[in-house]
């Protein structure tokens, strides 16, 4: 069938002739198309009856017109998409060419430097005379030749500091004033966040990023200036003074405070000058630096309990792209006064990788996130009907509330009770601002049940356990550390009416996904704890408890990433302004070392998957798989209480946090690679023979019972059998032959289906993954499995450890026999499984 012409005025018939439509008919059809792009046959006949102007057109012609119109719309969208991709590739190519030019200059500079120059030349001020490596955007920018110009607090003096800051920043952003090296673990490519680099051998710590974002330069500048919206550690930025400049820019004096990430370190503050200007090529620049007394500029008195840190010339170079969007260069360069913290925490303040993750890349991610939301049609609604901006606001409130609890600033109403030297610190807050937000929803006749907020917090050092692994375990196995009665008590503070706990009860946990960022480095979800509480208006029917939960840092391969699990009880109404009392965990890596064995395994089979025949890891990419040798975990729990119960709740909270610490230490020990290796008793680096033997038993037993091979490509080598079994597309899971069978092994597909890890697998029993029908079927088939040796199960539904339903086409269960023909375990294979 031939297509119509582009103007939409021709329709085609089966005999090859075209029908010409009048402009009025085309206009009417276009209106109908916008209302219903794909009408049914009945709807098309109805359209002809409703529009007299279309009465002389046959229904088949109308059908063809709509087909052609949809085709043109699809072609238009595809052409628009290809144009956007082409613009993006052009901009990225330009960015890469500039980066290549900068690297060539850096190489040239390094080649011409000799050892005498390095040893005898005093370290010059950063970029004042970097004319040999002038960047592509500094043409027309006059570098300051004076080493110590006379300045004061006058507008002229501040402008002099601002111009010097601009020159220094540009030489870092696109020049060679700082020796940049690629961020470990970052793989450049069209799908990467951008080009990320960290400093090597400079004063303080520095990080640099450049990338393409789909926002106009002015919008980009507006976002990056609003630092608290994307930098989670930023407590406040106060603009103390604004001075316009002759070139249309502005000079601002800022006072900025940062939260301390842990209870073991004091918070930081900065006294800054920020300069916003437009370069000759149209680029927009926002640059900043600390103001010091040596500059004779305005000063800011030191603030009690804060450590005054220094920001060296940093900022954002924002250049417009042809066809829309911007290319942005980001530089963060700070001296965080690492000497003011305990020695064990100093890597946190001396690592450029940490600075890159929490500051530089956070800004770039925020820009890309907002750009994606802008491009979505009508700012599409997602996450339980919430728009992206509303969900971002909720995540910011969770993070900010947790930071407030960890820091406990006195100017926010927090005060320490009891012994401040105790392992668990107890603080209370009865300020009106805190309570007003807490009791926001008490408008249904119930009196507010809380007039004090109590926080129990502590920090602990962890050895040899990756933060991402530990945090994933805490998320997936809440029952290992949480007390359900405490969960119900926490929820009572934010319910629309009083709610009490069901003592001794344990409900199910269901995780409901809510939203995630572009790169999935952070996601928000709702935890539904079923039947943990009840309310006085209906004391018989159990109430569900909902927790709003924020997770980040779950990527094991990310370098310098802080892992967080922050949650807060939330009312079922889930209002945007719902009161939140955040609690949770923060795990910060302190240093990294190459892992000698992977912690992501069980006590038997997984060891061999991670250890090769020469004692090295099977994976060839070892650069990203480094485990954190040390990390610091901070725990904070907030309780809404009545003032007369303060001492009682403080004692309870202290014991609760101590219990959590004990649970975390136990879990961390179990996840530690050294502990696993000692328990397994590895005598050689060749992998566990038990693992390879079990894989062989599984395949031999399947072949003996079913008469066919389990694996498509079988090999005589045990190691090949093991790897093929591990990478099999169907879920293969083994369980013990006990009164209450528990899982002992699963291949990668099995772990994905159960949404668990190899370490946590043994906490899941067989009956937990089946619904009622599945359990009945299993009970009826179990005797056949034991007598006949195998059974074929019909397709059905099972549940992951997260409570998500999983459908499977069919399943096979069989006994796994050892060398003596004795039953070792039962193995299941779930064929063609998928999440419902």
From Swiss-Prot:
Biological process per Gene Ontology, one example term: cell differentiation
Induction record: By auxin. Repressed by miR165 and miR166.
DNA-binding region positions on the chain: 14-77
Domain START: 151-379
GO MF annotation, one: DNA binding
Tissue-specificity statement: Highly expressed the developing vascular elements and the adaxial portion of cotyledons. Expressed in developing ovules, stamens and carpels. Expressed in procambium and shoot meristem.
Localization, UniProt: Nucleus
Alphabetically ordered keywords of this record: Coiled coil, Differentiation, DNA-binding, Homeobox, Nucleus, Transcription, Transcription regulation
Effect of residue 606 to V: In cna-1; dominant negative. Loss of organogenesis and formation of ring-like corona meristems
One Pfam family linked to the record: MEKHLA
Subunit structure: Interacts with ESR1 and ESR2. Interacts with ZPR3.
Protein known as: Homeobox-leucine zipper protein ATHB-15
Organism encoding this protein: Arabidopsis thaliana (Mouse-ear cress)
């Amino acid at each position: 069938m031939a297509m119509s012409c582009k103007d939409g005025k021709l329709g085609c018939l089966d005999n090859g002739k075209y029908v010409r439509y009048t402009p009025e008919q085309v206009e009417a059809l276009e209106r109908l198309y916008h209302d219903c792009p794909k009408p049914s046959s009945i709807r098309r006949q109805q359209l002809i009856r409703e529009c007299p102007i279309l009465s002389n057109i046959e229904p088949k012609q109308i059908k063809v017109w709509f087909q052609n119109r949809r085709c043109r719309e699809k072609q238009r969208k595809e052409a628009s998409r290809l144009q956007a991709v082409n613009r993006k590739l052009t901009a990225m190519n330009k960015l890469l060419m500039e980066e290549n030019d900068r690297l060539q200059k850096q190489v040239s500079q390094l080649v011409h430097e000799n050892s005498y120059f390095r040893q005898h030349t005093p370290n010059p001020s950063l970029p004042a005379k970097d004319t040999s490596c002038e960047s592509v955007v500094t043409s027309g920018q006059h570098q300051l030749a004076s080493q110590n110009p006379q300045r004061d607090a006058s507008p002229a003096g501040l402008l002099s500091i601002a111009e010097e800051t601009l020159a220094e920043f540009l030489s870092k952003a696109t020049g060679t004033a700082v020796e940049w090296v690629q961020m470990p673990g970052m793989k450049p490519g069209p799908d990467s966040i951008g080009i990320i680099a960290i400093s090597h051998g400079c004063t303080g710590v520095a990080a640099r990023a450049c990338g393409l974002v789909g926002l106009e330069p002015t919008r980009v500048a507006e976002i990056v200036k609003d630092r608290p919206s994307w930098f989670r550690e930023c407590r406040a930025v106060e603009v103390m003074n604004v001075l316009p400049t002759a070139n249309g820019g502005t000079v601002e004096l800022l006072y900025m405070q940062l939260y301390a990430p842990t209870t073991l370190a004091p918070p930081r503050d900065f006294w800054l000058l920020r300069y916003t200007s437009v370069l000759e090529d149209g680029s927009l620049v926002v640059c900043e630096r600390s103001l010091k007394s040596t500059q004779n500029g305005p000063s800011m008195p030191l603030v009690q309990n804060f450590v005054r840190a220094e920001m060296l010339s940093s900022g954002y170079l924002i250049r417009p792209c042809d066809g829309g969007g911007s290319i942005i260069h980001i530089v963060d360069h700070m001296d965080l006064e690492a000497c003011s913290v305990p020695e064990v925490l100093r890597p946190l303040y001396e690592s450029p990788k940490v600075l890159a993750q929490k500051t530089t890349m956070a800004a770039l991610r925020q820009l890309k996130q907002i750009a994606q939301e802008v491009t979505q049609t009508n700012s599409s609604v997602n996450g339980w009907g919430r728009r992206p901006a509303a969900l971002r606001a909720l995540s910011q409130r969770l993070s900010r509330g947790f930071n407030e609890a960890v820091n406990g600033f006195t100017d926010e109403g927090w005060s320490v009770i009891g012994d401040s030297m105790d392992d668990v610190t107890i603080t209370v807050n009865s300020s009106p601002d805190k309570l007003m937000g807490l009791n926001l929803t008490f408008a249904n006749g119930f009196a507010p049940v809380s007039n004090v907020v109590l926080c129990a917090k502590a920090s602990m050092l962890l050895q040899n356990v990756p933060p991402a692994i530990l945090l994933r375990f805490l998320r997936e196995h809440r029952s290992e550390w949480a007390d359900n009665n405490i969960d119900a008590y926490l929820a009572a503070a934010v319910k629309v009416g009083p709610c009490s706990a069901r003592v001794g009860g344990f409900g199910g946990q269901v995780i409901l996904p809510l939203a995630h960022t572009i790169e999935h480095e952070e996601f928000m979800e709702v935890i539904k704890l079923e039947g943990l509480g009840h309310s006085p208006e209906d004391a018989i029917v159990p109430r569900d408890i909902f927790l709003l939960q924020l997770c980040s840092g779950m990527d094991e391969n990310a370098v310098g990433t802080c892992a967080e699990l922050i949650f807060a009880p939330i009312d079922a109404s889930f209002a945007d302004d719902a009161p939140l009392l955040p609690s949770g965990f923060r795990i910060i890596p302190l240093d990294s070392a190459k892992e000698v064995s992977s912690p992501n395994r069980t006590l038997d089979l997984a060891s061999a998957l991670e250890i090769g025949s020469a004692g090295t890891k099977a994976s060839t990419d070892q650069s990203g798989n480094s485990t954190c040798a040390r990390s610091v975990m901070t725990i904070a729990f907030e309780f809404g209480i009545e003032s007369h119960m303060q001492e009682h709740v403080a004692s309870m909270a202290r014991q609760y946090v101590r219990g959590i610490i004990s649970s975390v230490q136990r879990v961390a020990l179990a996840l530690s690679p050294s502990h696993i290796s000692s328990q397994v008793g590895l005598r050689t680096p060749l992998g566990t023979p038990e693992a390879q033997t079990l894989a062989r038993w599984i395949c031999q037993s399947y072949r003996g019972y079913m008469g066919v091979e389990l694996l498509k490509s079988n090999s005589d080598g045990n190691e090949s059998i093991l790897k093929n079994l591990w990478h099999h597309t169907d879920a293969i899971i083994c369980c013990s032959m006990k009164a209450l069978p528990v899982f002992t092994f699963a291949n990668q597909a099995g772990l994905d289906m159960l949404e668990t890890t190899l370490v946590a697998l043994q906490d899941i029993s067989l009956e937990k993954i089946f619904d009622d029908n599945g359990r009945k079927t299993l009970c009826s088939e179990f005797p056949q499995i034991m007598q006949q040796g195998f059974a074929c199960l019909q397709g059905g539904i099972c549940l992951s450890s997260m409570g998500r339903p999983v459908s499977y086409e069919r399943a096979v269960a069989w006994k796994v026999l050892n060398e003596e023909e004795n039953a070792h375990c039962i193995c299941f294979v779930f064929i063609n499984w998928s999440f419902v």
